[in-house]
């Protein structure tokens, strides 16, 4: 009897200690195949396939001794290629491409030792360039440019070690300046100016360390003052004034710690 009890106690320990070998499949509750992959001595080996609930192929991945290796692919539900990426010893290496369903590129970026390195480009569905920016050690570095669908310049931003830095400019598709901003170490700083498409000044806003600060002014396109507002540490404070386009005072509001009085 004691031997039988010892044997019964030993069996679960053996089963828990087993390592996966061969094909291993997991399924959706409906019974449809979800993942199929091969194991050798408990680690993934070879091709892994993932499937949508409908049975369509979702992605393929390759493993060597448990590490991601070679090309991985992802597919849209309808079957079109979504993206490709290459791995070397578990790290992203080389070009990653993402695609629209039509087959046109959404974006392309290069990896070195799992870090984005070099130029990244993103595209409109039409194939026109949408965004271009460079990476150094996985951080944005230097000038980023954005473009309208027409190809006209949309904006310019500057990055230093992944943080927005200095003056940025945004443009209307017609080419006119839309607004000018300023950043210091990723935070909004100083005077921001916004313009109507006609070129007339629309507003002047002030920031200190990312917070709305001081007097903000808004203008009618005709040039007349529209309103004056005030902030202290990102909170509405003091008297706010609103004007008719004729220049006459329309009404005022007063705020104390963000609460209208």
Please state what every model-predicted region is.
Residues 4, 15-244, 248-261:
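Periodic aromatic/glycine/histidine/acidic cluster detector
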Residues 11-12:
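Repetitive helical segments and hydrophobic/amphipathic motifs
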């Amino acid at each position: 009897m004691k031997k039988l009890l010892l044997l019964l106690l030993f069996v679960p320990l053996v089963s828990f200690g087993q390592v996966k070998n061969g094909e291993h499949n997991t399924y959706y509750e409906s019974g449809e195949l979800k993942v199929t992959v091969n194991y050798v001595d408990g680690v993934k080996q070879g091709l892994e396939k993932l499937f949508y609930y409908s049975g369509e192929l979702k992605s393929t991945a390759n493993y060597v001794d448990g590490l991601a290796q070679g090309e991985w692919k992802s597919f849209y539900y309808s079957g079109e290629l979504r993206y490709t990426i290459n791995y070397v010893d578990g790290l992203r290496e080389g070009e990653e491409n993402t695609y629209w369903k039509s087959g046109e590129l959404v974006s392309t970026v290069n990896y070195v030792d799992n870090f984005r390195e070099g130029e990244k480009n993103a595209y409109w569905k039409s194939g026109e360039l949408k965004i271009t920016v460079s990476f150094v050690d996985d951080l944005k570095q230097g000038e980023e440019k954005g473009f309208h669908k027409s190809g006209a310049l949309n904006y310019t931003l500057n990055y230093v070690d992944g943080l927005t830095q200095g003056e940025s400019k945004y443009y209307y598709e017609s080419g006119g300046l839309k607004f000018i901003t300023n950043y210091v170490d990723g935070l909004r700083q100083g005077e921001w100016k916004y313009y109507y498409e006609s070129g007339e000044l629309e507003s002047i806003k002030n920031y200190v360390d990312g917070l709305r600060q001081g007097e903000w002014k808004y203008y009618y396109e005709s040039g007349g003052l529209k309103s004056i507002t005030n902030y202290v540490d990102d909170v509405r404070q003091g008297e706010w004034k609103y004007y008719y386009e004729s220049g006459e005072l329309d009404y005022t509001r007063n705020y104390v710690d963000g609460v209208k009085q």
